[in-house]
Swiss-Prot record:
Residues 656-895 are annotated as: Hexokinase large subdomain 2. The gene is Hk2. It comes from Rattus norvegicus (Rat). Residues 1-16 are annotated as: Mitochondrial-binding peptide (MBP). Keywords: Acetylation, Allosteric enzyme, ATP-binding, Cytoplasm, Glycolysis, Kinase, Membrane, Mitochondrion, Mitochondrion outer membrane, Nucleotide-binding, Repeat, Transferase. This is Hexokinase-2.
């Protein structure tokens, strides 16, 4: 008993000595995590070089675009063919994908051989043979009469220019068919099929095996965005942001990049990591200096690396008592399968003994232990190097997405990964150590790259079908030149109706006289008070207008809030509160007791009977002060001033915010005769000839008309242009049937139109994977500011996704593109409709004056116009297009409607003084 224990201890000690001896000899092959992180950093730099337009030609890691723009989302369905060509045998598959609540993939396939004389014959012979095998397969399945979509896995070096266009760079794997290199392989297959004439197929996609692996696994796990192959060769692919792929136009969405990572190090970046054994393997290979990384990790070279180490250690008399055999000295005699067998847990040492005996050696126990350790070090290095480059890919995806923690799946195939007893486990552990902030799942591809080619095709078909369905819906929101001209014509008709005494009562576009009869001429001067009331806060302003050399406007203002109990109390309480705030402001400005002319911007629906008289028709915006509706707001204000008996004010003018905008801009530009607001709401005003304003006596001069154009279409004249989404938004609004034009163009409603379209798309499975979140059902979540942010040119889809996430909407990259497109279409239509309305206004001014050409400026305010990245540009283009005889400039109002009220007051005072003289 004691003797056997001593023998066991002796053996253990001998084994440990052998392991230490090997570890020392192969010190440079045992890579620390620090070294692996350095390799990962270098690989990230190589990835960037491959993606960059200027650095791509000289980059070792080529980062080739595959034109695969999306991974499966589980809703794919249909019947597809796949062709898998990458060696002396090739497979033809029929893949049926069903999506009836249960994802299912059914496959039938047949393997066909390619005789050597065809491999080395002409390209025509090769592709005719492939077409013949395809015909044979379709005959067997009795599907020749169908025109099925086909995906083609073509595992040779190619230059891909489209999803269905791939030019062979060079043959490998023993193929030498003439007349194929430099040609599009898809075109060659199509021509071979046409030559037969007995069937037809639709070749949708050509991919390599790595992409096929990612797509196969992507169907089972929608987080799969990386494909990895570690077999005879090694490569990886992943989904990259389009904005980083300089070789392909466009910066929205993602595209799968075929990395061709086997060439990492071909430019010398791994020289300090490569060992003498790596250099020897490279020197003896068919392609010296090429695919250096692949030669360190793939199955084609792993066994040979072990053989070279055994030879070197034997020569150094560290193994086999210094003896060599002819078999051990024969290149390729130690296979990668031998490495896997020796590393088996159960009988690895026994397997080592058998393999070494096969190689003509007479190994001792310690030789077998040493060989086992050599295999372990070589395969561990391979897994570690793979992990380092994968870590770089994961880090890049994480950076691209801007996530603190990435959750991702890697689809894997290849004999080394699948058959080596420990490779997969070592790879997984190393990846998790190198990128601890990534939750990585590894998913084995069980069905090969043929299924992957079919999945690429299925995804392409799904995307095309969904795109067609979405475009059909969005088409109803896209307006042609003729439709916009018709909107302009109808607006002009409605304007005439509103101006006419006979039809004014029934006209939706009310064309209200404002009694503002002139715009600033630059001679205005004096101090004026302005009051700007249009919400829960209001402003009191002191506006100092100077003329002559010191011409300009100086403003001081203070914002006051209106408590809810005052908003809902009596009219007296409301106007007493306003006067109290005016008194406070005058004291604040050191002007207590001073009497000044006052302009009053009052942004509620009113009927104006003179410049200083405005009857409140109804409260809006949450105001409910009693005793005000039907009363003149100027009188109510004056009565409150008299009750206070502290100061007196000369209320000269009461205006709405649109007129205020025109007057503010009119002070800067004498050509400004139109005011436009496109913000939460929308309205316009312009200077009309008095002879056309039938509601006011007098024929001479001009008067500003407040169009109240938001009600355009309330009589049904826009019904043919309104979509189901416009109708839905209108029906659920606070004022159904009212302000229909405003609901198609203003910021308050555009987000709701977008939300309704997104719900429709989601219900039809065209967005958010068909899952409607509670958040999406919430009215009002899409504020105008989000539309503006989403459409911003400088905003990447990453930020669009962040905005959607903030709204509680989990989206894919494809979803983000769709949401952005919907926002673009809705905002563009709004800008075009606004432009059509404005074209009607400026053309009317031109016709009023009998001019061939009109030069006019439009003063504009409103958040949608100012903050949306494209609204203003599209609106300007539309006006130019629809009113070619008008030279229209647009001037943004910078100081709001309060300054405008003061300027109207200043103009009125100027005219009044001139009349007195």
């Amino acid at each position: 008993m004691i003797a056997s224990h001593m023998i066991a201890c002796l053996f253990t000690e001998l084994n440990q000595n052998q392991v230490q001896k090997v570890d020392q000899f192969l010190y440079h092959m045992r890579l620390s995590d620090e070294t692996l992180l350095e390799i990962s950093r270098r690989f990230r730099k190589e990835m960037e070089k491959g993606l960059g337009a200027t650095t791509h030609p000289t980059a070792a890691v080529k980062m080739l675009p595959t034109f695969v723009r999306s991974t499966p989302d589980g809703t794919e369905h249909g019947e597809f063919l796949a062709l898998d060509l990458g060696g002396t045998n090739f497979r033809v598959l029929r893949v049926r994908v069903t999506d009836n609540g249960l994802q299912r993939v059914e496959m039938e396939n047949q393997i066909y051989a390619i005789p050597e004389d065809i491999m080395r014959g002409s390209g025509t012979q090769l592709f005719d043979h492939i077409a013949e095998c395809l015909a044979n397969f379709m005959d067997k399945l009795q599907i020749k009469e169908k025109k099925l979509p086909l995906g083609f896995t073509f595992s040779f070096p190619c230059h891909q220019t489209k999803l269905d266009e791939s030019f062979l760079v060079s043959w490998t794997k023993g193929f030498k068919s003439s007349g194929v290199e430099g040609r599009d392989v898809v075109d060659l297959i199509r021509k071979a099929i046409q030559r037969r004439g007995d069937f037809d197929i639709d070749i949708v996609a050509v991919v390599n095996d790595t992409v096929g692996t990612m797509m196969t696994c992507g169907y089972d796990d929608q987080n799969c965005e990386i494909g990895l192959i570690v077999g005879t060769g090694s490569n990886a692919c992943y989904m990259e942001e389009m904005r980083h792929i300089d070789m392909v136009e466009g910066d929205e969405g993602r595209m799968c990049i075929n990395m061709e990572w086997g060439a990492f190090g071909d430019d010398g970046t791994l020289n300090d990591i490569r060992t003498e054994f790596d250099r020897e393997i490279d020197m003896g290979s068919l392609n010296p200096g090429k695919q250096l990384f692949e030669k360190m990790i793939s199955g084609m070279y792993m066994g040979e690396l072990v053989r070279l180490i055994l030879v070197k250690m034997a020569k150094a008399e560290l193994l086999f008592q210094g003896k060599l055999s002819p078999e051990l000295l024969t290149t390729g005699s130690f296979e990668t399968k031998d490495v896997s067998d020796i590393e088996e847990d159960k009988d690895g040492i026994e397997k080592a003994y058998q393999i070494l005996m096969r190689l003509g050696l007479n190994p001792l126990q310690e030789d077998c232990v040493a060989t086992h350790r050599i295999c372990q070090i070589v395969s561990t290095r391979s897994a570690s190097l793979c992990a380092a480059t994968l870590a770089a890919v994961l880090w890049r995806i994480k950076e691209n997405k801007g996530e603190e923690r990435l959750r991702s799946t890697i689809g894997v195939d290849g004999s080394v990964y699948k058959k080596h007893p420990h490779f997969a486990k070592r790879l997984h552990k190393a990846v998790r150590r190198l990128v601890p902030d990534c939750d990585v799942r590894f998913l084995r591809s069980e069905d090969g790259s043929g299924k992957g080619a079919a999945m690429v095709t299925a995804v392409a078909y799904r995307l095309a079908d969904q795109h067609r369905a979405r475009q059909k819906t969005l088409e109803s929101l896209k307006l042609s030149h003729e439709q916009l001209l018709e909107v302009k014509r109808r607006m002009k008709v409605e304007m005439e109706q509103g101006l006419s005494k006979e039809t004014h009562a029934v006209a939706p576009v009310k064309m209200l006289p404002t009694y503002v009869c002139a715009t600033p001429d630059g001679t205005e001067k004096g101090d004026f008070l302005a009051l700007d009331l249009g919400g829960t806060n209001f402003r009191v302003l002191l506006v100092r207008v100077r003329n002559g050399k010191r011409r300009g406007v100086e403003m001081h203002n203070k914002i006051y809030s209106i408590p809810q109990e005052v908003m809902h109390g009596t009219g007296e309480e409301l106007f007493d509160h306003i006067v109290q705030c005016i008194a406070d402001f005058l004291e604040y400005m050191g002007m207590k007791g001073v009497s000044l002319p006052l302009g009053f911007t009052f942004s509620f629906p009113c009927q104006q009977n003179s410049l200083d008289q405005s009857i409140l028709l109804k409260w809006t915006k949450g105001f409910k002060a009693s005793g005000c509706e039907g009363e003149d707001v100027v009188t109510l204000l004056k009565e409150a001033i008299h009750r206070r008996e502290e100061f007196d004010l000369d209320v000269v003018a009461v205006v709405n915010d649109t007129v205020g905008t025109m007057m503010t801009c009119g002070y800067e530009d004498p050509h400004c005769e139109v005011g436009l607001i496109v913000g939460t709401g929308s309205n316009a005003c312009y200077m009309e000839e008095m002879r056309n304003v039938e509601l006011v006596d007098g024929e001479e001069g001009r008067m500003c008309v407040n169009m109240e154009w938001g009600a355009f279409g309330d009589n049904g004249c826009l019904d043919d242009l309104r979509t189901v989404f416009d109708v839905a938004v209108d029906e659920l609004s606070l004022n159904p049937g009212k302000q229909r034009f405003e609901k198609m163009i203003s910021g308050m409603y555009l987000g709701e139109i977008v939300r309704n379209i997104l719900i429709d798309f989601t219900k039809r499975g065209l967005l958010f994977r068909g899952r409607i979140s509670e958040r999406l059902k919430t009215r009002g979540i899409f504020e105008t500011k989000f539309l503006s942010q989403i459409e911003s040119d400088c905003l990447a889809l990453l930020q669009v996704r962040a905005i959607l996430r903030h709204l509680g909407l989990e989206s894919t990259c494809d979803d983000s593109i769709i949401v952005k497109e919907v926002c673009t279409v809705v905002a563009r239509r709004a800008a075009q409709l606004c432009g059509a309305g404005m074209a009607a206004v400026v053309d009317k001014i031109r016709e009023n004056r009998g001019l061939d050409n009109l030069k006019v400026t439009v003063g504009v305010d409103g958040t949608l116009y100012k903050l949306h990245p494209h609204f203003a540009k599209v609106m300007h283009e539309t006006v130019r297009d629809l009113a070619p005889k008008c030279d229209v400039s647009f001037l943004e109002s910078e100081d709001g409607s309060g300054k405008g009220a003061a300027l109207i007051t200043a103009v009125a005072c100027r005219i009044r003084e001139a009349g007195q003289r």
